[in-house]
């Protein structure tokens, strides 16, 4: 599709195809993977909420939104001011670049009240894990479907899943998209799906 795509009648350059492919791979895989692992970690650290989900799958949509808020897989995004303006007392000139910190926004006390508490019943949950405005993630519905499906399957297949220990889990070093490096767990094996 990208090889044959055209913008204003011009085909994409090799570099544009490469960058779009990387964007699709990062946006369509890494972010969802990091949300699932980081969100699962929080559910396992808040055992009461894990047990609620095991007992009632109808709670998964709220849990998924809290997983997105908590993990904020895309840490930041740069934007350029399109006009002179003032932002919280700071003058910005047209062309100035600024970095938006999604993780900071998702832990804003003015928005979330108790942002440091992981709560699957948080409502409303006005997180910006998918960005906002004209830059809102086009894949947000696919990501939500993937997250809810995977979370449901993990809860069904591994209801007694636990972290191997209480040590802090290492994060993958990155300044744009980040998540857990590894997450040792223990569980009781069940009969394989495909025997």
Describe these PLM feature segments.
Residues 1-195:
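Cytochrome P450
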């Amino acid at each position: 599709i990208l090889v044959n795509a055209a913008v204003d009648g011009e085909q994409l350059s090799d570099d544009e195809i490469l960058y779009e492919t990387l964007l699709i791979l990062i946006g369509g895989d890494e972010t969802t993977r990091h949300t699932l692992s980081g969100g699962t970690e929080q559910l396992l650290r808040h055992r009461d909420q894990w047990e609620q989900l095991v007992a009632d799958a109808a709670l998964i949509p709220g849990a998924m939104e809290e997983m997105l808020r908590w993990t904020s897989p895309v840490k930041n995004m740069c934007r350029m001011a399109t006009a002179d303006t003032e932002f919280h007392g700071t003058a910005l000139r047209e062309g100035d670049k600024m970095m938006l910190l999604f993780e900071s926004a998702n832990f804003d006390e003015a928005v979330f009240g108790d942002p440091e508490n992981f709560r699957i019943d948080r409502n409303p949950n006005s997180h910006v894990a998918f960005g906002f405005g004209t830059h809102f993630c086009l894949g947000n519905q696919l990501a939500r479907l993937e997250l809810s499906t995977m979370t449901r399957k993990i809860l069904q297949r591994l209801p007694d899943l636990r972290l191997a220990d209480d040590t802090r889990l290492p994060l993958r070093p990155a300044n744009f998209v980040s998540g857990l490096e590894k997450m040792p767990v223990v569980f009781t094996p069940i009969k394989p799906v495909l025997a």
